[in-house]
Amino acid sequence: KKKLPVVIAVSIANGTGDAQGSERGLEYDTMSGKYAEFVEREVLPRAAAEAHVKFTKDPNGRATMGYSSGGACALIMAWHHPELYRRVLAYSGTFINQQWPYNPQAPHGAWEFHEHLIARSPRKPIRIWLQVGDQDLLNPNVMRDGMHDWVLANENMAKVLAAKNYHYQFVFARNAVHVDRPTVR
């Protein structure tokens, strides 16, 4: 009989603002391992000390999870540090071009995952759960770069993950908007 092990969630408030040029965009949408390193170096030791808990070091027992840009951040953390995290839950994941400041290694931000990174990289030992609503965000007028359609981005993610033989699940929710409350329940 399999049982779910004890789960400890550590939630981190993001910086202010949204999109490119915001503190939140810098924290969550930056295509690097810096945020995972910050969590590992500063957040988890403090949480463990204050809550008197011990976190597993087994990456198969650790997950990252987020909504919107937090969903992109969850995959960014696992992608850059699969030795730390191997489970990703991305709800209305912002796999679009939200990164700020510009990064020449990933010029299209999280859009790079389905555009280039996953297809061109060796398969990583991570499992991914994705969800998007059919009425999720599309911001064609904010940035006219063709990389701000949440539905298309998540559909593209599912396609490239399947082509690369990843362990993943893609949930396409009908009549659902961005981070749709009824879908969460």
What is the predicted function of each stretch?
Residues 1-185:
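Non-catalytic cap/lid and distal C-terminal segments of serine-dependent acyl enzymes
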